[in-house]
């Protein structure tokens, strides 16, 4: 019996020696992941009578939290560096570097994903098939959202959604915060294919960029993560209306209602902000290196000018900057000068300049980006008395050769919207007309 046992043990050792355990990838596992941002904890909390004890009941995983999901991949770039590639409908955004380390207290593996060009990151602990941590926006006080992710999950909201019983393809007239003092109009632009849904919401101050989600039964869900914002739209059909709630991270939510429309309306972007003076708009602000720059400098004399009212924290502003850079590359002109006046969340000069410097470098912006003030509408409005206030970030000012404001474009309809192509044509026509003027 002992000989038999020894023989079996020998065979087991030999078999084990022939098996090669796959080497765990050093870092996050490449491939597809599903991430969630936890907006609310739905676990029931019960106070035990007569005791100072809190008991949290255990519920199924899919009911523990109210979340905003998104999809991403871990890929390698040409330098063999790991990249965090976020997917929202037709857009893919790449963020890097991804840094790794060890928690000195527990020995757990840690990760840190830089979300440049924004002043934000995701950090936490990782295992071969899961991540757990927080999304942190550094230039917003105490802004942190719990984050989790699972490897190999390719669905967004539901793995096996109920068959769609509604069709929301097309355009919808939307009102956010109806009957409140802060109500604002929007247009929903949706493309539905069975359960799959993508689209965006346009407003008079900008769009919500690329949204992706589903239609399940009579319910509609859309989400987006772009490195700066976490958006979730949770709605359902109620008769002929679409009713829901828009969540921006954990700090803002507003109800909305929409009706299908073949001709939805928003105020035209060039009529929202009014020009109230023809006095030349001239300024002098620090650039990212601390040098004073003025549009009144002789080297800019007799040129038409575009002035961006912008901020490094603003995704719509980023879209606008990318458009302007593309236009300048395709249409170089010695008669046009561009300036970006950045209004930053950091109140401290050095921090704001560092933020602008990093943003400009990451975006490869080749025109001056100047520190103009603090990120709010009042701060921006105060430096431009020639108009009746700044209504949105971004806002674009068009100046003639005398530095007079001749047109104001409020907000930005980016590449996720149906209006992007017409905006590009309008922009080109405006520049052409200004260059012709002497």
Model-predicted segments: where are they?
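Central antiparallel beta-sheet cores of small beta-barrel/beta-sandwich binding domains
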Residues: 27, 34-122, 126, 158-159, ...
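Short active-site neighborhood of thiol/selenol oxidoreductases, capturing the structured segment around
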Residues: 293-324, 339
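C-terminal motif of bacterial Sec signal peptides marking the signal peptidase cleavage site
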Residues: 15-17
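N-terminal "domain-start" segment that seeds a small globular fold
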Residues: 261-297
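Structural micro-motif
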Residues: 364-368, 387-397
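Structural microenvironment flanking redox-active thiols in thiol-disulfide oxidoreductases
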Residues: 319-364, 375-383
